[in-house]
Amino acid sequence: DMMRLVHAIGIETVLSDLAVYIEQDFLRWELFDKTPRIASHSPNGVIELMPTSDGEVYGFKYVNGHPKNTSEGLQTVTAFGLLADVSNGYPVLLSEMTILTALRTAAMSALAAKYLAPAGAKTMALIGNGAQCEFQALAFRTICGIQNLRFYDIDRGATEKAMRNLGQTGLHLTACDSPED
């Protein structure tokens, strides 16, 4: 499963490798069908289907976002995906992708920052300290060399949890009282 793979390889290696694959795919941008995601919105959240193909492989990801799920003991986000061979239409992979979604999001963010952030930046702010922020922190350290993190969330408990979970990573962590800090 994905978590065993991440633990065996190491999260920094997974994030770094993902960023390389993402960058390689950007270099093949013109080959991809760029179909907008299909979204179904409800008062409780959103379900999205994200299809694409490079002409050889067709793939899609199904992902939801239901913020109040945690009050019922459910995950806020769940995802799965499928890859199929375009030449014969046969599925070649069906995979749970919840953790991969978090990793890919973080790797993509850090890859963008690699090109867009000021050269030599070592400090960043994480505004909103839910589960994704921990993946972001590790990706930005691995891909961009970030060493100092400033945390802010309207839920102080989220900041405390993120800082606790990242406390042994060697990053310099600072809790902030406002987004301006």
State where each predicted segment sits.
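N-terminal ligand-binding/catalytic initiation module
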Residues: 1-102, 110, 117-120
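Short helix-loop-beta connector
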Residues: 116-123, 145
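A structural signal for isolated positions on well-ordered beta-strands in alpha/beta enzyme cores
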Residues: 125, 149-150, 174
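Glycine-rich Rossmann-fold phosphate-binding loop(s) that bind the pyrophosphate
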Residues: 129-130
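N-terminal Rossmann-fold NAD(P) dinucleotide-binding loop
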Residues: 133-134
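Gly/Ala-rich phosphate-binding loop of Rossmann-like dinucleotide-binding domains
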Residues: 137, 141-142
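NAD(P)-binding Rossmann-fold cofactor-contacting core
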Residues: 143-169
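Short acidic low-complexity segments
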Residues: 169-181
